Amino acid sequence: MSCFSHVMNPITGQNSWQERGDDYDYHLEVANAGFGDMLHDWERNQKYFAALRKTIAGMREAGREVHVLDIGTGTGILSMMALAAGADSVTACEAFLPMANCAEKILAANGAGDKVRLIRKRSTEIQVGEDMPRKANLLVAELLDTELIGEGAIGIYNHAHAELLTEDALCIPARARCYAQVAQSPLAAQWNSLKTIANLDGEPLLHPPEQLKSCQGEAALHDVQLSQLPSSAFRPLTDPVEIFQFDFQRKQEREKQRSQLLKLQSKQPGAAELVFYWWDIQLDDDGEILLSCAPYWAHPQLKELAAEKAKDHPLPNVVPWRDHWMQAIYYIPKPLQLLEAGKSFHLSCHHDEYSLWFDAREEAPTKSVRRHTCTCDLHMTYSRSRIGQLNQSPRNKRYLRYLEESIEAEKSNVLVLGNGCLLGLASSALGAASVLLHEPHRFSRRLIESIVKHNQLKNVQFLDKVEELEDSRLAALTHIFAEPYFLNAILPWDNFYFGTLLTKIKDRLPEGVKISPCSARIYALPVEFLDLHKIRAPVGSCEGFDLRLFDEMVERSAEQAVSLVEAQPLWEYPCRALSEPQEVLSVDFSNFGQEHSLKGSIELKHPRICNGVALWVDWQLVEDNSPRSIVSSGPSEPVVPGEFVKWDMFVRQGVHFPRRPKEAITHLEWSTVFKPLLGELTFSFGQKKL
């Protein structure tokens, strides 16, 4: 049976009805649940198993029976570990029904089907006596996220201790510790604030208005693979400090709100702009089995791991990799200038039931620091990567070079297409006679209007629909400009919506109008990821347990609900290039409606496993041979086969993960079909050994 879903096509900008199986949402949720990433986390699996063995053995030695509760069992892996470690009984709960049904089959396949009581409920809905025969005296759970408490761990543990666990119950993990490190990073700060846009001579063109300067931003975490932030891109102002402990084992309730005020001293001069955050967990009661989510420079086992892995891995990648628990950046509402080493200041740390926030001040605050929110529209409208992109100087210079060479003072009439296109707005400051901004998004327009007003730009008008432009206005246009960037875009080529907008006015444009970008090219690059491929790779077995049924479930769902190409910020996920990039599509925006069907083959120059294909767009601003006329969303430096690729840090690239990567392939075969008027762009890839 099928149903119809309302879907927005980012290339056409049209909503349409698409026929999908009535279980499409189920498949989408299964494919994106992220269980596979956790099961590939060998350190997590080994240490949970070790903690179960140690804890259950200790309870046995003390003459205690062991009755285990596994909250959020997923595949049932922790329940099977508990049985293997000698538990007398195991009760598991899983509220996500597709996963619970899969867990039931996995338990049976591993001979544990009649030994684990599986409850298809949230733990907060379980009744002792009705759902489980007795209270448990050992709780094992994985209820944590990058923020530690963002998935509701505080409330779940409080309920479990009150209703489901004995007075003397033990917990795995037993406790957690949260850490903060204050730092300055001009690069990371670009993800949080808007800089002045200057011309090629450094003279200001657009100043951010006061409401942007005074805005404290959003308190929400910015989760990143912090180990991949170049060491040259930040200045640590303090050592890591412990800010909170969470005792999961104590019977007393865990507080839902706490504050911690720390008096710190700066190690060196700088601006306290941001807080790096991570946590570790002690899985056993003695605190001997430790799992740390620290970035490499603060990892407690860095020396041992470097000695073991440094030959094959860059230093930032010797620590265990995981994508379900990363690190986070929190931005200080008002950066604090610390002018000398040894300068004292106060770090104010806060958490509620689900989140954290921070502030840094010279003097201790006299009252509690409230969680801050955006008041300027920038942070609530744009993603972190888009804010950073607006500040990206090398990229902006290429656009500004084109505009400075192309705009004629008092003569040029410019139509700007895209959301939040400050570079297009800069053409007004460069002297254009008139600037029309296509800005239909409410909050984005409100932000741009504030910038127009603050910079006293008199020749700027806004429009909602390009097709409603009068013929006389279109006939007067000398330039059409875009970055392009649209809020609905996820993959780089979703911004081909620029071409769709052009087709709506193409027949009414004057013959000599200059369109920039004039064309775009998509490139493909076969790569070998160190780790990212694990989010889609089959698990097979984990700690001796057969999880092939889980692999089959995820693969079936992925085939029905996951695009062959997904968006990822590749600067966070190191990969080696296996060849030079190859063009797989070229689009001319003056003839955007033309359909394309292409195929080719890429010869691999480096003998490794191709477990991914990276794709991106190069925008050609003007038809010349200068590399300065190209703005790329891909590598930021030339690609060298066999070497790690350095990626643009302010945009997500496209990635294709082969279902079953083959060893020793020599060629990657590809095909591209593009039907622009339908908004259909499809890629297919095949691995071949010649």
From Swiss-Prot:
One of its GO terms (molecular function) is protein-arginine omega-N symmetric methyltransferase activity. CDD domains: AdoMet_MTases. The keyword tRNA processing does not apply. PROSITE patterns: SAM_MT_PRMT. GO terms for biological process: chromatin remodeling; peptidyl-arginine methylation; regulation of DNA-templated transcription. The keyword Transferase applies. Essential arginine methyltransferase that can both catalyze the formation of omega-N monomethylarginine (MMA) and symmetrical dimethylarginine (sDMA). Specifically mediates the symmetrical dimethylation of arginine residues in the small nuclear ribonucleoproteins SmD1 and SmD3. This is Protein arginine N-methyltransferase 7. It comes from Drosophila melanogaster (Fruit fly). The lineage of its organism: Eukaryota, Metazoa, Ecdysozoa, Arthropoda, Hexapoda.
